Structure formats: C-alpha cells, structure tokens
Amino acid sequence: NEEAEKHPDVKFAMMFNQRTNPLYQKVKEILDAGTIGNLRRVSWIITSWWRTQKYYDSSAWRATWAGEGGGVLVNQAPHQLDLLQWLCGMPSLMEAHLKYGSHRNITVEDDVTAYFEYPNGATGTFITCTHDALGTDRLEIHGDNGKIIITDSKSVVVKKMDKPEDVWNHELDFRQM
C-alpha cells in the first residue's frame, strides 16, 4: 500500500496468535506424532461470530471492501484458516461458494462454504458465516487410525482405533460393527 511504500525501512509482519494457544499446540503434537494416522478428512464449522445489522452500521468501514477488504474471511476467520493450514498442511485444490450480503445489508461475504483437497487425496470443508445466532465451533480431523474433535475451541477429544481403518475394512464384516 502507499503508506508502506513511504517507509521501506519499517518491517511489517502478521502474527497468527492461535498457533500459540496450548490447545492447538497439543493438537499439532498429536498430528505430528501420527497418532491418528494419515489425514483423510477435515471439517470445520465455525459460525460462532454472529453480527447484527447494527454492528455493521456502527462504523462506515465495517463490512466494506474499502474499509476491511472483505467480510467474514478477512475479519473473523483468518486465524481459523491459518490453523487449518498449520495443522493439516496446504491444500492442493480449493473451491468455495461465497454469498455477499446474503443475510445483512453489506457488500462483502457473510456466508462461506469451502471445499478443499490435499495432495494425499484427503478432503476438507470449511463453513463460516456471521448470521448464525446460535453458532457452532467444531473442528474434526479424521485420519485413517483415529479422529480429533475440537469443540468450541476449548475441548479436545481424541478417538483412536486399535487397528487402522484399512485393516478393519479387510477383517470385519459390516454385521460385526
């Protein structure tokens, strides 16, 4: 931007502070240790940042391209998107459906459903919005040997299988489940 060009000696950096959150550091350790095996699917529904029309109307810069540069993806969700990449790696494909001003009188996105694929074939979804008054925050990371479930960015449950899924696939009959 123009202001940065005026001061080339000044360093600019961005910090994604959620990487320092002990909860997510523990999840990263679990993933890096291979506890749940190879990534198969990740799904994050993060709709817990409800905003009213009065919120958007309170300042001219809110929910505008000129003021914020975007909507929910830029203002509320960048930390979660960073965590997804940090925890699960960089997707090789990403597609998204965005709705602009779908539930509020704004010009930027307020409802997003994204789908992505990873180099190993794993898939993922990321759903976010600012119009869910009850809100949800649930991240599931599914591997071929277990699953991590994070609820409300506060609690972590690790479910581990005694054998990898592909072994169960060959050994068990569906009636044994």
Language-model-derived ranges and their functions:
Residues N1-K11:
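Rossmann-fold NAD(P)-binding glycine/threonine-rich loop
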Residues M94-A96, F126, I141:
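Generic preference for hydrophobic
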Residues A122:
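Glycine-rich GHKL/ HATPase_c ATP-binding element in histidine kinases
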Residues L39-S43, T125-T128, I150-D152:
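Beta-strand scaffold of nucleotide-dependent catalytic cores
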